[in-house]
Curated annotation (Swiss-Prot):
Designated name of the protein: Chromosome-anchoring protein RacA
HAMAP family membership: RacA (MF_01170)
Gene that this sequence comes from: racA
Family, as annotated: Belongs to the RacA family.
UniProt entry keywords in alphabetical sequence: Cell cycle, Cell division, Chromosome partition, Coiled coil, Cytoplasm, DNA-binding, Sporulation
Residues within the DNA-binding region(s): 3-23
Residues in coiled coil: 75-156
InterPro entries the UniProt entry points to: Chrosome_anchoring_RacA, DNA-bd_dom_put_sf, MerR-type_HTH_dom
UniProt cross-references to Pfam families, sorted A to Z: MerR_1
Gene Ontology cellular component terms for the protein in this record: cytoplasm
Amino acid sequence: MNTNMVASELGVSAKTVQRWVKQLNLPAERNELGHYSFTAEDVKVLKSVQKQISEGTAIQDIHLPKSAKKRTGFLVQKTSSDTERRIEQLEQKLDTLLQQRQDESELMARMSELERQLKQKADEGVSYQLLQHRREIDDILADLQSLTSQMKEFTAHSIPETAAASEKTKTRKKPLLSLFKFQT
């Protein structure tokens, strides 16, 4: 019987039963979960204690029946295989969690390495692009300088030609009109 069942049989609270067991060092056994487990003999002893208390005996002066055995500790029940199975399951879960934590650590390290490599590649790409742009700018500047020098040469040579061309046009004034002139 558990504490609640004994308490209801005696008509007291479960806390009262627990207090009597502790203060009087009664022979109640405990199961693997730490709960009291009472036998029929334990219930008789508790009824005797209840009777003495109701008669006004102080808790220190209560006499226990001689049949009361000494407390033997925890009661080992047949659930040891269940307990072993549960322990095994918990150990498996612990192993799984430890493995997951290790895997997580490895993944985090791998992600950090990949981020570092990606950053390095990005830096290299930007550097390459900057160099390529610099080369293109240098090529464009060279072409611009070449075009500028060619333009200067062209403008220097074209000025005398334009002056000579303008002089020629002055001398040839109205050559077609002379052909169509009517003689009068």
